Amino acid sequence: IQLVGKLNPLGTVSGTNYSALWGYSANGRDYAVLGGNQSIYFIDVTDSTNIRVCGSFTTHSSNWHEMKTYSHYAYLVSEADNSGVQIFDLANLPVSVSYVGQYNPPGHSRTHSIQQSGPYLYLNGGTFNGIKVLDLTVNPAAPVPRGLWNNFYVHDCSVVNDTIWAANIDDGKMSVINAQNKDNMTTI
């Protein structure tokens, strides 16, 4: 492995103020989506000799942020109270990024981790403890709440087709969940 370039937007030593990283590609360009404890950065990494921040936004203060992308949108969650799901429009990269807004599912305040599979987001842990599904089919900028599975606390999950593999760390187990019906997920 060879380091071909680096950028540290905060100028800190050892990256102590960063919490997660995700990738996004569009129009032949590659981007890093970097979460900081009070910020999110959209970084063009296409040319390792010219790595640059295309956009950054202040976010809810938390040591933990996680993000995923779908279509030309990025979705950011955190464990900060009342952080919901922050939505960013990436359509104008590399020129700019737009903040769409914050979506708060009914009764939802915070999320530990997020997964994406097809036009669905899976919110783990946090307010609901289990998994809350958001549907992006109609309008990715305006998620629609679907089902909730909360038999056990879910720290993180992996979604393969319509099957969820959920880490139930507080219970020392893993759950396998049928998510074919997003409104009524069932344990297999």
Give names to the regions the model predicted:
Residues 1-188:
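Feature marking well-ordered beta-strand scaffolds used for ligand recognition
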